[in-house]
Amino acid sequence: MVQFVTIPNLTDYQVTLKLMQNYVNKVINVNEPEIVYLVEHSEVYTAGTNYKQEELLNYSDIPVIYTGRGGKFTFHGPGQRVIYPILNLASPNRSKDLKLYIKMLEEWIINSLNYFGIKAYLIKDKVGIWVKVRKDEFAKIAAIGIRVRKWVTYHGVAINISTDLSKFGGIIPCGLENSLVTSLNQLGVHIEMSEFDKIIQTEFNKIFT
């Protein structure tokens, strides 16, 4: 069974990035076991490899980090659960199939949200997990951006629990103009982060083990 490790308190993004990179090296070089890090970051905008500078609108005093993950700009901050699975897709019980891996990530998050009564969707040509907020109008509740090195995954998923959604106003999230963002709180679901963590671990084990 894959170990889940919760990093306490707000964590600097670059510190976590180094932690991930170091652990990926251990998985590749000395066959360390797979792990999933659960993190809550200090405020930061991160840019993936497909970012466009004009998608950074107004970030005031929030730092901007240019990362190696896929995707474009997103926001991380308090009240958001960020999940970093470090999995070895080359291991016998996995598959060297990135599309399948992303599909499994999506299914995992959708099932976890469903536990709390939130019906979530995938939208063609729009990365991430979405919920319907009005008739024919959707808002993103979770962002996905991954990277793989020698078939070992890192980076991952960010889910808005009680996030200050106004912070997304400093960017064009994931490069999608006029897209809405939402959170569990905004949808009327008020839970502790620890309660959410229990469910995502349960749902992870149903799909990845």
Swiss-Prot record:
GO terms for molecular function: lipoyl(octanoyl) transferase activity. Residues 30-209 form the BPL/LPL catalytic domain. GO terms for biological process: protein modification process. Catalyzes the transfer of endogenously produced octanoic acid from octanoyl-acyl-carrier-protein onto the lipoyl domains of lipoate-dependent enzymes. Lipoyl-ACP can also act as a substrate although octanoyl-ACP is likely to be the physiological substrate. The keyword Cytoplasm applies. CDD domains: LipB. In the reaction, the free carboxyl group of octanoic acid is attached via an amide linkage to the epsilon-amino group of a specific lysine residue of lipoyl domains of lipoate-dependent enzymes. Disulfide bonds: none annotated. Its EC number is 2.3.1.181. The record marks K140 as: Lowers pKa of active site Cys. Its main location: cytoplasm. Keywords: Acyltransferase, Cytoplasm, Transferase. The active site is at C174 (acyl-thioester intermediate). This is Octanoyltransferase. It catalyses: octanoyl-[ACP] + L-lysyl-[protein] = N(6)-octanoyl-L-lysyl-[protein] + holo-[ACP] + H(+).
